């Protein structure tokens, strides 16, 4: 509605003010909004929540509602706007912010609407590599982190950020955080962001630059994980 009636604007503003003023009597909707935001943050950013603690999170949600002009009510928009709110303030330390941003990347890969179409990497493919293309999973994000990631926890490392991960959603709709070596990052970056290489060309170029590197085994490994896609030329 581009031009809502004046009375509607007044009523909406009054409700928003009640919500922002806190948990006051007579504003059950405000309680609902706070609980909803709190639930979104808890479910989307569990590592971050564990690090900051319950009381600090309650205050962060309160500050978010009081100070951030959120425009979209959907679950994923609340999560994104909460991250933006934290990024533009001094609410948490740098390490906690990086944990939050990593979890947002994983969440972004989960809800990405891109279609994952994985063709098996069989011997037939390698018999005719000129007939196939090689590309990255469209939900892929490459990140460098000061911690190591497992499915249930993160482990802070003492050194400067040097843990490389590929975060993506596979064909089984699972979000994967795959640890990478520097050589993996370099090769994957040649296929990003949306570049689609001939399988034959990629093999030849890689073999020319890395004489002792088994590029075929490397491709098989990452197509099996779902990080790389092999498709018939023309698809």
Enumerate the language-model features and the residues they cover:
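N-terminal, charged low-complexity regulatory/assembly segments
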Residues: 1-114
């Amino acid at each position: 509605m581009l031009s809502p009636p004046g009375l509607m604007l007044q009523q909406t503003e009054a409700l928003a003010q009640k919500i922002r003023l806190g948990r006051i009597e007579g504003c059950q909707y405000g309680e609902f909004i706070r609980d909803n935001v709190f639930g979104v943050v808890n479910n989307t950013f569990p590592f971050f929540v564990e690090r900051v603690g319950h009381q600090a999170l309650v205050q962060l949600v309160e500050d978010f509602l009081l100070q951030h002009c959120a425009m979209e009510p959907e679950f994923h928009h609340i999560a994104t706007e909460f991250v933006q709110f934290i990024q533009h303030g001094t609410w948490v330390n740098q390490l906690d912010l990086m944990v939050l941003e990593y979890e947002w990347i994983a969440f972004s890969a989960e809800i990405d609407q891109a279609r994952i179409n994985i063709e098996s990497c069989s011997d037939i493919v390698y018999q005719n590599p000129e007939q196939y293309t090689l590309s990255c999973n469209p939900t892929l994000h490459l990140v460098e982190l000061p911690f190591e990631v497992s499915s249930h926890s993160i482990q802070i490392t003492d050194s400067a950020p040097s843990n490389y991960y590929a975060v993506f959603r596979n064909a089984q709709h699972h979000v994967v955080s795959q640890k990478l070596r520097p050589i993996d990052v370099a090769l994957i970056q040649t296929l990003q962001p949306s570049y689609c290489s001939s399988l034959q060309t990629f093999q030849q170029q890689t073999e020319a630059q890395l004489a002792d590197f088994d590029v075929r085994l490397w491709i098989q490994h990452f197509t099996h994980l779902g990080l790389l896609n092999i498709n018939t030329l023309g698809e």
